[in-house]
Amino acid sequence: MSFGRPPTFSDFKVSPPERGSFPLDHDGECKSVMQEYMNCIKYNRNDNGKCRHLSRAYLQCRMDKGLMEQDNMDNLGFKDVVDPASTETKNAAAAAAAYRAASQGRGAHSGLAVSYAGDTHGVERHTNSAKAGSGSAADESNRDANARANANGHVSRQDASYAGDSHAQSGTARLV
């Protein structure tokens, strides 16, 4: 191409995308699987090892919907992924489901063992007080050190525990 001359595209060569590059999911056909994976990643503090079964499901969805070429999962790096029927995977899936339920504004008592900061009825097993979750002296005496940190807005280190209101009825629960 030279200056002053109209551009020519004869030198332009079309090449296929590199392996791993595939079209965007404009219609949202696999959005729910992708969202579940992203929630799992957030819940596990960016430890993708606990969410590999979900990334495998996402790639399988993309292959099923024609958004990427069919390929063996071994070639995509999933040779060592544990079967979803295993206990650890079930626990991770349950935790991701609990995370998803909390992110959709459902209550802490929807059949899953989810606890919110300030919730005296959940996994923390604290005795009830008149001012549950308020941070009052009566409330603090019923809590252990981790629960006090939760009441002060710190990150909870318990399984399936989220910061927000005690029952997530206002829909403003903030996922940690």
UniProtKB/Swiss-Prot annotation:
<comment type="similarity">
    <text>Belongs to the COX19 family.</text>
</comment>
<dbReference type="Pfam" id="PF06747">
    <property type="entry name" value="CHCH"/>
</dbReference>
<keyword id="KW-1015">Disulfide bond</keyword>
<dbReference type="InterPro" id="IPR051383">
    <property type="entry name" value="COX19"/>
</dbReference>
<protein>
    <recommendedName>
        <fullName>Cytochrome c oxidase assembly protein COX19</fullName>
    </recommendedName>
</protein>
<dbReference type="GO" id="GO:0033617">
    <property type="term" value="P:mitochondrial cytochrome c oxidase assembly"/>
</dbReference>
<feature type="region of interest" description="Disordered">
    <location>
        <begin position="1"/>
        <end position="20"/>
    </location>
</feature>
<feature type="short sequence motif" description="Cx9C motif 2">
    <location>
        <begin position="51"/>
        <end position="61"/>
    </location>
</feature>
<feature type="compositionally biased region" description="Polar residues">
    <location>
        <begin position="167"/>
        <end position="176"/>
    </location>
</feature>
<comment type="function">
    <text>Required for the assembly of mitochondrial cytochrome c oxidase.</text>
</comment>
<feature type="disulfide bond">
    <location>
        <begin position="40"/>
        <end position="51"/>
    </location>
</feature>
<keyword id="KW-0963">Cytoplasm</keyword>
<keyword id="KW-0496">Mitochondrion</keyword>
<dbReference type="InterPro" id="IPR010625">
    <property type="entry name" value="CHCH"/>
</dbReference>
<dbReference type="GO" id="GO:0005758">
    <property type="term" value="C:mitochondrial intermembrane space"/>
</dbReference>
<feature type="disulfide bond">
    <location>
        <begin position="30"/>
        <end position="61"/>
    </location>
</feature>
<feature type="region of interest" description="Disordered">
    <location>
        <begin position="124"/>
        <end position="176"/>
    </location>
</feature>
<feature type="short sequence motif" description="Cx9C motif 1">
    <location>
        <begin position="30"/>
        <end position="40"/>
    </location>
</feature>
<feature type="domain" description="CHCH">
    <location>
        <begin position="27"/>
        <end position="69"/>
    </location>
</feature>
